[in-house]
Regions:
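Hinge/lid segment of periplasmic solute-binding proteins
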Residues: 43-78, 145-205, 389-395, 566-589
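Extracytoplasmic "Venus flytrap"
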Residues: 61, 66, 81-100, 202
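Extracytoplasmic "Venus flytrap"/periplasmic binding protein-like
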Residues: 103-180, 215-217, 221-223, 354, ...
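Glycine-centered hinge/linker elements that transmit conformational signals in sensory
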Residues: 238-244, 281-345, 395
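Short, polar/charged alpha-helical segment
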Residues: 69-75, 92-112, 207, 211, ...
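Extracytoplasmic/periplasmic substrate-recognition and gating elements
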Residues: 188, 192, 212, 336-342, ...
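Long, aromatic- and glycine/proline-rich binding clefts that accommodate carbohydrate-like moieties
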Residues: 69-71, 83, 387-397, 409, ...
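Periplasmic solute-binding protein
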Residues: 145-165, 181-228, 240, 263-312, ...
Length: 589
């Protein structure tokens, strides 16, 4: 294996591979991630001992790793030669699974695994096709837990906790340890039934250039203009002030044009997720309460006793409320005034590569799944030692946000199995899924994507030792904040269909002649129409039943969401980084 760079920070070096590249991080522990075990025949069977040696970073000791791997080898005997095909979205973690873990599992067990990678929109379409048609297309999906509202209603997804206790009792890893999964609550219904098993999760956080913010000259100029410190913004007004400052007051650093804000806005499906991934929640559209706000939760949908009753303000929803209009207007205003022109050609998957070029001061909506790209040897946002020049912090909040509301978004891509898949295929895929999330494997997988899923990994000394190299990600996952940065909730009854409406309407707003208010009124009406149609379809539970239409003031004058318009401008508030991390451990609930 070629190592493209070796830069020890504390005298010892650990290497991670991603996107076909190798980059180095230095820690005080000896950690090493090799490529899959090789032999003269790349498809030759592997022994348990071979595989144990591969996963040397595991939280388990050698004896415990051997025991897990022996169990997989034995449990797979009845399925040897079975071919299974699974699919997931395109992020570094899943590329690691597809390129390495699938092959190792095949060589260990004899189950032939094909792990496909595709774009998130395509993944959703394929899942929806199998769900709607009943045809067998894939044996397993790594599907966002944002779909939990769909899965609990349709009855088309295997309820994992029921199967683990019954049909799959003999093929469920004894050391699977469900309670060790940090995102397991995201995949349950109100009764505690588990529908999906987390495979990876990543948070949406605030990202900023700590080196630029620490520049004494910049600090002095910012304070002179705005009357408070250049530091980590706590609200949207401070974020906007900082964006204005770097875009127009600083303008250039080392002869290169720089920008105070960064975003992505290409007119394609990921544009919808840019808003639907809790952007409205950060503005303060929701009600108080966790995980998503009660009774008004994500997407401004009101649900009463789990029954969706409306998205429009006239039905008690908040999708077209003053807070939602404010959120959408800020997105467009910042994009057009403070972001580089290239932003409008970028997507969820391409944005991180641009950010790594080093021309941006901050990003309010940054996905931690792309840490590997920012740490790549070609990145311009690391120093000569490979340490990040950036830091992560809690997301700034809009002027409607109140203590007790949801604080941010977290994606939890989770193993999902459909009843329409033949039993043998489903069972073999279940074995592979458990391998990818087993304690033997997960820490090495973490090092190849930085999307942790287990308490035992994030609380380990090895993860703690990575603090300096990850710019705040360790602090986030070791704090209570990981529990309140939540995915979309159960209020959303048909995620795939309704998600498609988002990007089409947001695209029209960005690139057409329509206001934020008009956009959200149209979208809220579409949501209500769709939920009305769903009410005629038999569902297992929580079928929509829309409220009667009332005058908007009826709901706006009631306590809670939808909130009345706030005319007053926020005063910008910032905090030094040393104080920011404390916020992740206090008052998060």
């Amino acid at each position: 294996m070629k190592l493209r760079r070796s830069v020890p920070i504390h005298g010892l070096t650990q290497f991670c591979s991603t996107k076909g590249r190798i980059f180095a991080l230095g820690f005080s522990l000896v950690l090493f991630v090799p490529t899959p075990v090789s032999s003269s025949n790349s498809d030759a069977p592997l022994t348990v001992n071979d595989v144990t040696k591969h996963f040397i970073n595991s939280s388990l000791n050698v004896t415990e790793r051997n025991a897990e791997l022996e169990w997989f080898k034995e449990a797979a005997k009845a399925y040897k030669g079975t071919k299974v095909t699974v699919i997931s979205e395109d992020i570094p973690t899943h590329r690691y699974e597809s390129q390495y873990l699938a092959k190792i599992f095949t060589q260990l067990t004899g189950i032939q695994v094909s792990h496909e990678i595709t774009g998130e929109d395509d993944l959703v379409k394929r899942l929806q096709l199998q769900m709607n048609s009943g045809l067998h297309i894939y044996d397993g999906y790594i599907n966002d837990s944002d779909f939990i509202g769909t899965h609990i209603r349709t009855g088309k997804v295997v309820p994992l906790s029921d199967f683990i206790e019954n049909e799959w009792r003999d093929i469920t890893l004894p050391t699977l340890d469900i309670d060790d999964f940090i995102g397991i609550e995201f995949t349950k219904n109100a009764q505690g039934t588990i529908y999906q098993l987390p495979d990876q999760q990543f948070a949406n956080l605030y990202w900023y250039r700590h080196d630029w913010f620490s520049n004494p000259d910049f600090q002095k100029k910012f304070h002179a203009k705005y009357g408070y410190e250049l530091a980590v913004p706590q609200n949207w007004q401070a974020y906007e002030d900082i964006a204005q400052f770097f875009t127009y007051d600083i303008q250039e650093i080392d002869g290169e044009r720089i920008w105070g804000h960064f975003d992505y806005a290409k007119y394609e499906p990921s544009l919808g997720w840019r808003i639907s991934d809790s952007w409205l929640s950060l503005a303060g559209v929701n009600d108080l309460g966790l995980p998503s706000g009660l009774p008004v939760g994500d997407w401004g949908i009101r649900a009463e006793e789990c029954i969706p009753v409306g998205a429009s303000v006239t039905r008690g929803g908040a999708l077209n409320s003053p807070a939602a209009i404010y959120a959408l207007e800020k997105y467009k205003f910042w994009l057009e005034n403070y972001a580089p022109p290239e932003s409008k050609s970028l997507t969820f998957r391409t944005a991180a590569q641009f950010l790594s070029q080093g021309r941006v001061a901050q990003q309010i909506f940054w996905y931690s799944a792309f840490v590997p790209i920012l740490l790549d040897e070609d990145s311009k946002v690391i120093d000569e030692n490979g340490d990040p020049l950036w830091r992560l912090a809690p997301s700034p909040r809009g002027k409607y946000w109140k203590q007790g509301m949801k604080s941010g978004y977290q994606d939890a891509g989770s193993w999902t199995f459909l009843h329409s898949t033949p039993d043998r295929q489903k069972e073999a895929a279940w074995l592979y899924a458990q391998f990818t999330v087993s304690k033997t494997v997960t820490f090495d997988k973490l090092l190849n994507g930085f999307t942790p899923i287990r308490h035992s990994d994030i609380q380990s000394p090895a993860f703690t030792a990575m603090q300096k190299g990850l710019g705040g990600l360790v602090e986030f996952y070791q704090s209570d904040a990981k529990n309140v940065w939540t995915p979309s909730g159960v209020n959303i009854p048909d995620y795939s269909t309704m998600a498609a409406m988002w990007w089409q309407h947001i695209g029209e707003y960005l690139y057409g002649d329509i206001t934020a208010k008009e956009t959200l009124f149209k979208l809220a009406s579409k949501f209500d129409q769709h939920m009305q149609s769903l009410s005629a379809i038999p569902m297992r539970q929580c079928s929509p039943k829309l409220n009667m239409i009332s005058d908007p003031t009826v709901w706006l004058n009631k306590p809670g969401a939808p909130w009345k318009e706030i005319v007053e401008k926020q005063q910008g508030v910032t905090l030094p980084l040393s104080e920011v991390y404390k916020l992740w451990n206090i008052d998060v609930r």
